[in-house]
Amino acid sequence: MIPEPSQDEFEEGYVDANGVETHYWERGPEEGRPIVLVHGGGSGADSWGNWKYAMPLLADAGFRTFAMDMVGFGKSATPDPDAFDYTNQARIDQVIGFVEALGLDRPSLIGNSMGGAASMGVAMQSPETIDKLILVGGAGHLTPDERPQFSRDAIDTLSSFDGSREAMFDVVDVLSETDWFDKAAMVDHRLSNLERPGIEAAFAETMRIATGGDMY
């Protein structure tokens, strides 16, 4: 089992990214080529849970790595759903704003699941913003022929989450290969994220929009 990294080994900051107060973790040499890591979804998701194992490896390879919390997740802002559209476009704009706010010179993007869809959007809408695009299980739109083949188990598990620890184990199971890290620690971390005001309402709206046709 891979050892748990300590948050003391990372820098932590906030920046205004297209009007969204955005929390992020940073690690790696200041002179290194920048990489922005964009996390996936699911109840209680955030950049730390998604990227804490990858960031030290990338930093040790000489990259300056940034892992941002998407709007409505982690320690980033959770605007009232009545006044904010939790769409993929909002996340695309947040990523572009994050790169601009930190003055990063054409970073590479690594996006997972929901974050993969946002990263693809950045590459399509603002290709001059980034250098390379790497997708890890990136979400996206499905054609009518593809929809019946798509696993409903994952969507049903995410959308039916009831706040219990047992249900969070199901969420982690459906999103991850769980035999190489401490699954209980990940479950507890994601549950602790749900204690922040506005997180659950933001996630419910994100899922409502995603399952209604804007599949990330």
Task: For the regions a language model picked out, list residue spans one by one.
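N-terminal cap/lid segment of alpha/beta-hydrolase-fold proteins
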Residues: 2-22
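Active-site loop/oxyanion-hole signature of alpha/beta-hydrolase fold enzymes
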Residues: 17, 52-55, 60, 67-110
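Conserved HGGG/HGGXW glycine-rich cap/lid loop of the alpha/beta-hydrolase fold
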Residues: 20-78
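Structural signature of beta-strand start/N-cap positions in the alpha/beta core
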Residues: 34, 62-64, 105-108, 129-132
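Catalytic nucleophile serine of serine hydrolases
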Residues: 76, 113, 137
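Gly/Ala-rich beta-loop-alpha elbow adjacent to hydrolase catalytic centers
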Residues: 111, 115, 119
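Conserved alpha/beta-hydrolase catalytic His-Asp/Glu region
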Residues: 149, 163-216
